[in-house]
Amino acid sequence: MLRRAVRERRQFIYKRNQELQEAKLNEKRRALRKALEGNKELNKDLQEDSQLQKDYKYDESRATQEETETNLDDEYHRLGEREPKVLVTTSREPSSRLAQFAKEVRLLIPNSYRLNRGNIVVGSLVEAARANDITDIVILHEHRGIPDGLVISHLPYGPTLSFSLHNVVLRHDIPNTGTMSEAYPHLIFENLTSKLGKRVKTALSALFPPDPKDTTPRVVTFANTDDYISFRHHIYAKTGPKQIILSEAGPRFEMKLFEITLGTVDMVDADVEWKLKPYQRHKRDVLAE
């Protein structure tokens, strides 16, 4: 079973690397075509790529439409076909506050299961999750009793997204929350419009069941502002034809993405797809265009 999982993972990673290389080549072809059509100077990378310039005469015979983009979210090709099964757990020896936060996350995500971590190592955790047809693993971390990290690992092959958590307020600390509804929630994603933002949006939406009922009173919001994703959970009730009352159900927190790896959480040698580099020169917002 272990050999089979390793073989399938290698085949998946090999196929994905081929798609990524083809995507980079298509991007260069588009840039070259755009520069020639606009009579603009080629950038340095295109000037030094002599093979690309030689092949351009063959590329001209292609249709003028954009080349087919590789499906970078191929890991989520079954998204919407079936309901996800999510495993929620914590780091080892969690504090009472982190354990309470894990309980609230379990109630937040339909069809999820909470596991008391104990002494289970990550490798055994992932292996057991695969054997039980788990689609995603959510691991919560803390620092001195304050939740400060969230890891989402998609099974069976990844990717794994790592977030830092800020300003965490538990549902337990919000007054007059009442009993949490476990109906499938509506999802709202705000300002996740870049390629990386859409990647994060797909990973987050994969945690929740597709096609909630129109009458469900729950709304879950992921709103991006300056690369901080604000998470909010509300319950609404209609009081008239065009009036509703909105109440916060909790918990609430801010998330900041700092790494995406092309593998599951147990793969220490997985390729890094994206990593936050605070001192690197790039545009300020990477999750929005």
Swiss-Prot record:
Entry-linked InterPro entries: Brix, IMP4/RPF1
Domain Brix: from-to ranges: 84-266
Entry's Gene Ontology molecular function annotations: rRNA primary transcript binding; snoRNA binding
Residue spans of biased composition, Basic and acidic residues class: 42-65
rRNA processing as UniProt keyword: yes
Locations listed in the record: Nucleus, Nucleolus
Gene3D superfamilies the record matches: Probable brix-domain ribosomal biogenesis protein (3.40.50.10480)
Function: Component of the U3 small nucleolar ribonucleoprotein. Required for the early cleavages at sites A0, A1 and A2 during 18S ribosomal pre-RNA processing.
Quaternary state and interactors: Component of a heterotrimeric complex containing imp3, imp4 and mpp10.
The protein's name in its UniProt record: U3 small nucleolar ribonucleoprotein protein imp4
Name of the gene this protein is made from: imp4
